[in-house]
């Protein structure tokens, strides 16, 4: 059987990053005013409903429930940093940020598949500006996912798609980014997610 767990097509992504200045709660001093801001910190929340590429009969009804399933949902909490606008990297890459994310995934069949949690690094960058506050962006994620329920002859015999409890997590997304306020933005787009154990173990 195939070594990959599932391939997901995310239909929408909602992100609310909020830059936080490290000295915003302090009274400005001459030194702080003169010193360039090295990093801008961001917090993000992504909600991604999606659909599975049903490449195995397990998704088409050959499972314990005897029902087809293909809907997915993931929720991600992200921390990112961006180089300050007065730094060399900030001037060269003004619309790029990177960080770490934690994602919860459900395939609405936790009894046989599990509800994996992904821990990953990511980078988000602009492709092109479409308007003053609207741009076309991309993002990639790479990490590990935990909490799968793999094939077991006794307890999980129908699951022919999950071979490992831990699998790689890979995502690539294309999205529109709308900066509707100085410290807030909203993104929506499509993404492709792949879970894999690299053929290290088969059901």
Kindly give the residue locations of the regions a language model identified:
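Short loop/turn motifs that connect adjacent beta-strands in outer-membrane beta-barrel proteins
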Residues: 24-40, 84-96, 111, 128-136, ...
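Transmembrane beta-strands of outer-membrane beta-barrel pores
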Residues: 47-53, 81-83, 102-108, 142-150, ...
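Extracellular loop and loop/strand-boundary signature of outer-membrane beta-barrel proteins
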Residues: 61-65, 107-110, 156-162, 198-202
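Short glycine/proline- and aromatic-enriched beta-strand/turn motifs that initiate or cap beta-hairpins
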Residues: 22-70, 74-82
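Cleavable N-terminal export/targeting peptides
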Residues: 1-37
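Transmembrane beta-strands of outer-membrane beta-barrel proteins
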Residues: 41-47, 96-100, 119, 134-142, ...
